[in-house]
């Protein structure tokens, strides 16, 4: 396929136009008084959002060269979103400012490679300064403040602080759409997985259609259980102990299942059978998680255990197990806390090492189930458009709060960057083009604060000058249009979000500035429509 090429200054200017198109669409959403962007959808109602990455993902430009610039800037937003889950608009604004400043320097004769080296060094120095300025998230109020700033809603902030309070920093918090108007929290303690009872005859509470076992023994079996002869020796020991039995196996069928059901109906003893969750290797891993949590062993031939030869020593225990038709919850497993902690650390190491997003998500789920519990935030709103917008904000706030717990918090509202670049005052001791690169980053660092102010209807240049004169931790609160101690006012940003935004923006801006050639496919010329012959008059014989 033929290509079109663009070189040097023309190439960089085309990229800049693309960056501007995307960044101008995104930056209006920045700050507490940021505006909304309406996105047209092929079907259904349009989406209204102020989430930077959602806007960025929708932008495709007509000019292929400009589109390259827009797509590269989109990468800034998505990468920041992947790492920190928030701060996508800040990253886009920083990238645009660095591209503008950098191109001005290149046009004036600076060497792009020298510029890039200076920019990278500056980003690293500012990142370190941000980390040093950070303080740990100590209280529930801190979490509520971070979530409130991210979601622009104090009710959501309080709700998320409560959620993190309950599940801890490793716990899973999921956001779901609700049919009601309000937003509420549902908490599941213990380990929950989505498999229910094999037969509804196991139900102990007919009103709620639940099977509840208090202080049961837990049998974990890797294969299928169909022959009752395999199960009988163990069953007899369990009946003698007087405790109920919870069975988790690939399947329980045939006479083994009917024996359990008949004994349950007669009241001889209480048991519930459930199919094990997931498939393949993940099933084995989850069974091992449950074994660690309950202090039992997985009965499997590969570890030399056969069902008809084992006793009570392989069974796990828990305070209670609740089984519905769709899911099972194990509360207070009797496993050794040290073993559970070891298992948690092992899964954390796997999370670090995996390249697959899907694997990472599934590992995080396993981690949460072992480490704390699961919180579901049910989001409600008057219309579907509002519901989607609210859900976006809450998802961002969850990510921001998690990032804050991880690396700590700094003063928000763009002021942390303005103060952190003071470490660049001597150009890091660099000279020439590298020093110019440092200045590019120093100038760009004002832009997020400037746009937060501009979107609030205040002159951004006046605000950035004033904030620079104030001490560390002080800044401009765009919601109240006052200057002051932002930390005390609860205007906080997670360091991880601000740092990721800066590092990713510097990376992409550096790539754009050092670009010399663009290569795109030549658009195909549309062929004129063929004349309408070809109406065959064939007759079937």
Curated annotation (Swiss-Prot):
Its EC number is 5.6.1.7. It comes from Nocardioides sp. (strain ATCC BAA-499 / JS614). It is found in: Cytoplasm. One of its GO terms (molecular function) is unfolded protein binding. PANTHER family: 60 KDA HEAT SHOCK PROTEIN, MITOCHONDRIAL. This is Chaperonin GroEL 1. The keyword Aminoacyl-tRNA synthetase does not apply. The gene is groEL1. Forms a cylinder of 14 subunits composed of two heptameric rings stacked back-to-back. Interacts with the co-chaperonin GroES. CDD domains: GroEL. It is an enzyme of class 5 (isomerase).
